[in-house]
Amino acid sequence: MPWPFGPSGSSEAPPPQKPRDDKVEGREPAKSWNSLLPKPDPPLQAAKEWAPVFLTAVGSLAAFMFYQSYLRRFAGAASIQENFFRKRSLLGRVTSVGDGDGFHLYHTPGGKLAGWGWLRKIPEGRSNLKGETISIRLAGIDAPEGPHFGRPGQPFAAEAQAHLSKYILHRRVRAHLHKRDQYNRIVATVSTRQPFIKKDVGLEMLKQGLATTYEAKSGVEWGGKESIYKAAEAKAKAKKLGLWSIKASEFESPRDFKNRTQGNEKSERDVEGSTVQKPWWRRWLTG
């Protein structure tokens, strides 16, 4: 007799349950957590791995090029690259003035921002500066020639040198490079601040009547200021300033002076060569 209070009146055991078949019921099979994460794209993964290497190489190259262009110090005219001319300028301190249109520059790339004058010391004294400066010639002007090799110089040569020294010696200047001349000097348009206004050094020499515009048929570097320079020269000439105060009959331009003295030197060399004493045996043969 079956138990009256059971869950079922039947004495048969319940049928065993079959395992759920997700495919039959139309459900997706269970997935692990890792399988749910997006799989990386192989090219993208390679790019991520090589990106730091690429950026490091590009950054190093950029830093090297920046150093070469802006922070490398040039110790002389011979070390300046040809691609700098007519494109770049150099900042530096004037260490000496040789005449009315030339001086020596100690290159200080980066200026005070690079520590020059407070972290990096500029050498002093001829021995410490030997081989460390750039010879600069002012573009577009020609100052009176000073005495050379025992020969007298031109009038106002000393005044021109003194004025240029007072104007730029031991001061910071910026030289806009044009070319390298036959004497390995850098021809440049030079500017300085006096005290806060930017001044063209060559132009100021012309205004004072202590230089003429450069006289040559070709190859003159003006820095785009030929008309400005010639106008300043004309004004100084009209006011009879400096060398323009010399009488017209006695005036000799720096170019004419150099041509004359160089011609005299050549004539003297020719005379000396023609009067060289003959060897004794030639004198004996020729009588």
From Swiss-Prot:
Enzyme Commission number: 3.1.-.-
GO CC, any one term: membrane
The protein, known as: Probable endonuclease LCL3
Residue ranges annotated for the TNase-like domain, each copy included: 88-246
Catalytic center residues: R137, E145, R185
InterPro entries recorded: SNase_OB-fold_sf, Staphylococal_nuclease_OB-fold
Gene3D superfamilies: 2.40.50.90
Annotated gene: LCL3
Regions of compositional bias (Basic and acidic residues) in chain numbering: 18-30, 254-272
Species annotation: Verticillium alfalfae (strain VaMs.102 / ATCC MYA-4576 / FGSC 10136) (Verticillium wilt of alfalfa)
Family membership: Belongs to the LCL3 family.
Residues that coordinate or bind Ca(2+): D142
